[in-house]
Amino acid sequence: MFNKKIMLIFNILIGLITIYVIICLVIFLSQRKLLYHPNENNYLDENKLTHKIEKVFVKSDNKLIGWYHFKDRKYKTLLFFHGNAGNLQNRIYKLNEIAELELNYLIIAYRGFSGNEGKPTEEGLYNDSCLLYTSPSPRDRSL
């Protein structure tokens, strides 16, 4: 009787541990899909840019597409990676608000988003941000 209870508890623990390991494995194997969502064109047509931008192309391992808004040289430039879902057009409402500040901005889409080549990776994001951070502004040289 005592051995049956111990075996039952042991079997339940083994089952719970197995389920936990399977869940962890599934999450680990699908982490890229969980972090980087596909493009969706769910932006509203009434979202129009209220300011001028320049379309820029950044050469890293892949060619990246971005938008640059230049207001004045005396202002700092905000480097903005728009996020892990959607595309540049999905961020127009944010860009209109940023344009009202005393800032220039450069918004870049992740690899694999907004027509960019490649696949998004953590290492690629670090490399792209370091390249853009250490580069002169698009006004100073062609990216």
Predicted regions and their residues:
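An N-terminal hydrophobic leader/cap segment in hydrolases
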Residues: I17-F57
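Membrane-embedded segments
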Residues: I65-L132
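Conserved small/polar residues in nucleotide/adenosyl-binding loops
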Residues: Y133-D140
